[in-house]
């Protein structure tokens, strides 16, 4: 039986009096790619940020390896070392080189040896075709190159789960496929456990083991990927897919 790595039960999230997430329930198995789909404003990114402690929640439980997470700042600081996140906006430090961006958290936060992390970073940069840019600054890179560095930076922390929030949304169309291929390799070669938010339906179809379809902060479908794209169970999901060009 495949190990369950993350479980969410009855999660509610509010901004003031407005409820952004309603009774969210799902589990994630080791090596699985879970894709969050739905229209803009459906709660996908809010859910992703909640799973990394960047947003708090008012009700429900999150379990990591069967351990219930205490929703405190200290607990999330420790957990973020195991749950990596890559953002749409890259979030690289502009005053640091590519290599310095990658080394910072593993060395300063995880207290690992710099030589060990540097070797790992060099191998990861080569895998994403960025081996010649380790001394470059973010301002010298294209959007696609910055996103590759952001992925490497997250992977250098040796995360158990990788969260990807619309990582191709800010890229030129010609850059999108290259970044998508990196994620596909992480899934197929490394069996990396991932939760992916995307509007790229072809990409989602290629990588999704499971799909959560959300609208208005609610999960309308929790369906295996191979079934969702061929035969969605709800009229709203069928309408959503019909509106997408894929």
Where are the model-predicted features located?
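ABC family nucleotide-binding domain
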Residues: 3-225
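C-terminal boundary and immediately downstream tail of ABC-type ATPase nucleotide-binding domains
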Residues: 226-246
